[in-house]
A protein has these predicted regions:
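Polytopic membrane enzymes that build or remodel cell-surface glycoconjugates and lipids
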Residues: 2-480, 484-508, 526-539, 543
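C-terminal luminal/periplasmic domains and tails of membrane-associated envelope-modifying transferases
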Residues: 3, 7, 450-701
């Protein structure tokens, strides 16, 4: 779409780009050999959401038999009770292609993420070098060397910022990095052509189709058209002062029209899907509290994280500070700051000819808009805060600050210029050192969870990471000493959880009724936190003792109000009820749970209930098919389907779902069952297909 290297015309500029690319690579090169972490990266190496195809033909088979409308639940019982169903057709196809290329080798994913980060760093450098020079005052200009030095320092300042470590080293984050790369290309294109009042029709069509890709790949790019609009309107005021505001506005809107049409199509698609969100706000007061009380405190947390990136952890959600009531000083301060910021942005929008207004708008506007999807303003999401959410907002903030630096440097004498550059270099050096230390935290699972344990904000998160560390040592270590240490960590986690239950009981009696509705809606109140603690306690104890009765007794007192309980907690509780043959109680829970949350577990257990208690095989089949429709790649659903048809002597369907399970899990045993059954049914086509997969898996093994 853009001939980037038309811009790179002289050796000096090429040298700047080369320095940036080499330094970014050298800084992160040691991370390429990092192993898988026992974290969300299990999604890849355990193939828990999608299988890893062995060939392109296998991708076609997956699409043929399973389809591309796959959903997965985005939730974390320890972060919040918010739960979202996610999944787009493009996401499924794209992941299949990536998995086909990289298989289960962590090096491939780390290299891919690093390449994307280098490309994003290059594009940032390109924008700073070619676009931001426009904002240097002509009267007291800075030298070309100083300009390029500032560009290098600011680019590396972003590339080495500590909050970006998670985005780069978290192997499952490649989709977001690609989305940001595509968004950066769009921004660069518009900045490069901002002097043109109109865009040719064929380029409008290309932009329209192009923007659909990042939209359907990742919803993080929904505010891109408004971000581009900010840059366009600001640039018009700077370089075309004779043109009026109305003409500026109309021209900018015309230029982003293809992006707005793409966004409109995405929004229509998004809201046309059934059960997009499994937890919904039905109270206007809760929504208002989320936007004007909750979001400002999340925003303030991100500002502190950018300026002082000291407390870095995968559990950043737990570090967000919320007031205990609506009118506490900190909450009021955050809300007022948030509202004033929005008002100042609006005022600066109409006063861009003034330097102060322009600088405020160009620094804060794009940054704020890019952060908006993560502030819980547009919609509630399960993860309250995460370091990786700052990747793109911080990049746009860097562009704005660089504009300010250029204006500042071109307004002061040489001695002050040197001082400003020196201070900037020192700040970047400090943050780079912190980033390198943070990168070492990610070297393996043990160090990652140890770092999270050190930053644990409360007993729940402390016990959670103790449980992870204990499980890693107990389950995966080969030495007796390590297994013993793992057992000790698990015991410590259990003791911590019992203490937490008592502490939360005191807090519940003290200020449960003072808390805002939005805090309760997110499950951050003592009552809901007790349920989370009980869940982790039951989960840990059943893993050690295998005692489902004891686990049931721990969880039972906290399962009265299912509307505040996360899906994973409900799933464990239902499993415990079935293990203890409490079918009536399980049915009561299921009938309540299925109204609030849909998951493979609730649907498959409902199927079991219909079959075991009521002997109603049609309803049992209905729930299994409903689960398969929403979650076609879900292993639990496929397991229950083939078992159901085997028990009901439906051999054709048994063969079919055995085949699906076999290709989903690369299971030779199930493919053999499928082959034998298809042979007995004289279905030579599917029998041959099963045999081909058996041979393919044999060769791969």
């Amino acid at each position: 779409m853009i001939k980037l290297f038309d811009i790179v015309k002289n050796l000096n500029n090429k040298l700047v780009y080369l320095i940036v690319v080499l330094m970014v690579f050298m800084f992160y090169a040691h991370t390429l050999n990092y192993p898988w972490r026992y974290f969300d990266e299990r999604i890849i190496y355990d193939e828990s959401i999608l299988p890893i195809p062995r060939s392109f033909l296998e991708i076609l088979d997956y699409i043929k038999y399973f389809g591309i409308h796959n959903h997965f639940e985005a939730s974390n019982p320890f972060y919040s009770t918010i739960s979202n169903l996610r999944g787009t057709p493009l996401d499924v196809v794209f992941n299949f292609i990536v998995f086909l290329c990289f298989k289960k080798n962590p090096f491939n994913y780390h290299l891919f993420s690093l390449i994307l980060h280098i490309l994003n760093s290059f594009l940032l450098c390109l924008i700073l070098l070619t676009h931001c020079k426009t904002y240097i005052k002509k009267s007291l200009s800075i030298s070309d060397f100083q300009r390029k030095a500032v560009v290098i320092v600011m680019t590396l300042g972003w590339a080495f910022h500590p909050t970006n470590i998670e985005s780069i080293l978290f192997a499952t984050n490649f989709g977001a990095l690609i989305t940001y790369f595509l968004c950066l290309l769009v921004i660069f294109y518009y900045l490069k052509n901002s002097g043109n009042k109109t865009i040719p029709i064929h380029l409008n069509i290309i932009l329209f189709l192009y923007y659909l890709f990042p939209l359907f790949l990742n919803e993080y790019s929904v505010t891109l058209p408004i971000i581009v609009f900010c840059y366009l309107i600001a640039n018009y005021y700077l370089v075309q002062e004779e043109v009026g505001f109305k003409n500026h506005l109309i021209s900018a809107l015309k230029q982003i029209t293809p992006l707005l049409i793409s966004l409109m199509i995405f929004v229509i698609y998004f809201f046309s899907l059934p059960a997009i969100r499994t937890t919904q706000e039905k109270n206007l007061i809760v929504s208002l509290e989320r936007v004007f009380w909750f979001a400002p405190q999340v925003f303030m947390h991100y500002i502190k994280l950018i300026l002082f990136p000291l407390h870095l952890t995968i559990d950043q959600t737990g570090l967000v500070q919320f007031s205990e009531s609506l009118f506490k000083p900190y909450a009021i301060f955050c809300s007022i700051t948030f509202i004033i910021l929005c008002l100042f942005l609006l005022i600066s929008f109409f006063n861009l000819k003034k330097n102060t207004a322009y600088l405020f708008f160009i620094i804060i506007g794009p940054f704020f808009l890019s952060l908006l999807p993560f502030l819980h303003v547009l919609s509630p999401t399960y993860c309250i805060a995460s370091e990786r959410y700052l990747y793109f907002p911080l990049l746009l903030l860097t562009i704005g600050i660089t504009n300010f630096l250029f204006l500042l440097l071109s307004s002061i004498n040489k001695n002050k210029q040197k001082l400003v550059i020196l201070v900037t270099v020192l700040l970047v050096t400090l943050t780079s050192c912190r980033a390198y230390a943070r990168a070492l935290d990610w070297k393996d699972s043990y160090s990652l969870f140890t770092s999270a344990l050190k930053e644990a904000p409360n007993d729940l998160f402390k016990a959670l990471r103790l449980e992870f560390l204990g499980s890693i040592l107990f389950d995966y270590s080969n030495t007796t000493a390590s297994k013993q240490k793992g057992q000790e960590l698990l015991t410590t986690a259990i003791d911590t959880l019992y203490n937490s239950l008592l502490d939360l009981e005191y807090k519940k009696l003290t200020y449960q009724n003072q808390l805002t509705l939005i805090i309760k809606s997110y499950g951050l109140d003592p009552k809901t936190m007790q349920a989370k603690v009980a869940y982790l306690l039951a989960f840990t104890k059943i893993g050690i003792d295998k005692d489902s009765i004891s686990a049931y007794q721990i969880l039972k007192p906290h399962m009265e109000d299912l509307s505040i309980i996360d899906t994973q907690i409900i799933d464990l509780y239902l499993g415990l009820l079935f293990n203890n043959y409490l079918f009536d109680k399980a049915e009561e829970i299921l009938n309540k749970a299925i109204k609030h949350r849909i998951s493979p577990t609730t649907l498959t257990i409902m199927s079991q209930l219909q079959a075991l208690k009521y002997k109603d095989m049609k309803k049992a089949e209905h729930y299994l098919k409903a689960s398969f429709k929403l979650f076609p790649y879900d292993v639990q659903t496929l397991t229950y389907l083939k078992s159901f048809y085997q028990q009901t002597n439906n051999y054709e369907q048994f063969a079919y779902y055995s085949f699906l399970y076999g290709i989903r899990m690369h299971s030779i045993e199930d493919l053999k069952n499928s082959y034998k059954t298809y042979v007995s049914l004289n279905n030579t086509v599917m029998a041959k297909k099963s045999l081909e997969y058996i041979s393919s898996i044999d060769k791969a093994n």
